[in-house]
Amino acid sequence: MNAPSNFDPNQPTVVQKYGGSSLADPAAIQRVADTVVERVQQGNKLVVVVSAMGGSTNALIELAGQISEHPKRRELDMLLSTGERVTMALLSMAIADRGIEAISFTGSQCGIITNDVHTDARIIDVRPVRVEDELARGRVVIVAGFQGMSYTREITTLGRGGSDTTALALAAALGADHCEIYSDVEGVFSADPRCVRDAKLLDQIGFGTLETLARGGAKVLHADAAAWARRAGIAFRARKTGSQETGTLVGVAGLEGIVAVSSSDQRRFLQPEHPLDGLHGCIVYSSDQGTVIDSQNLHGELPGIACKTLTAAGEDLLCDPKNLSQFLACVAPCQGWWATPFGLHARFDEHTDIAELTRRAHATLVV
């Protein structure tokens, strides 16, 4: 098919990602289609990465559990990758019904190449030749997030937050002018607004600070996706689906000082096999591949103790002893703490009121 007569190949390329809550049902998919068409009509080439419809991935996992107590990871990938394929096809249909040419691609069809770790693969290369060809024809390209193909031609999935990583990887490979991550929150806040009433929406934030918050439990972006954005240097905007607000720009220098706190009650504490100088109560695991700090995103199954954590992000926290002592005072008695280049993490036992600690840390530290 030839490009539309009014198509300009020099139009800016925009990569958008929509999460499952934004695509929860047919009505939500129709609303996203309206948003995509409006953006095309403003003079942009669009690549849209989609997650599975809200709740469908968990439903597929439960379905697998009804069939097998220990399903093979390869077969889980074959099953779980279908969720995003449903969404991509439905959204492509909805856009086409509005008079805009669209085509859907799986992760493998759009050139997402991964390693061979089933259910938790990592992207090693992106070859978006077909995506570029369809953009040149004036079509909107819909991509199934969360999945790719290994170098041995096996279907793989990227683990939780994989659709975010798909969008950022495609934006980098395409040299996109803009990348936008849409979810059900307005952007990045200085704390979880559900437990901190005066949490502030941040206009901008740096890569490292966002990654620290994500590893501490902030849900605006998965930590692996935040790490990918930092390594690739891909600036993006975190926005709420359907909102007119501009959200948070991620990738600029960010704000000075201490900018935010986050918390999690789903971390695993792995007892250190040996002490590390300068790190107290550090989450550490030693293996043949080396020493890993921060167990939240370790790959594979490792033994650990469930614990709660609180994270404060900002460079001033680590260079100003007063700020450090304030943080430790407001979260005491913590069981242990450890530092990263952009923030400080504290660990607590299972009986700790993590929401109250989050409010206290926010009131004490966030400027």
For the regions a protein language model found, what residue spans apply to each?
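Short linear loop/turn motifs
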Residues: Q109-I113, G242-T246, Y285-S286, T291
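A conserved active-site cap/scaffold subdomain adjacent to cofactor or substrate pockets
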Residues: A214-Q271
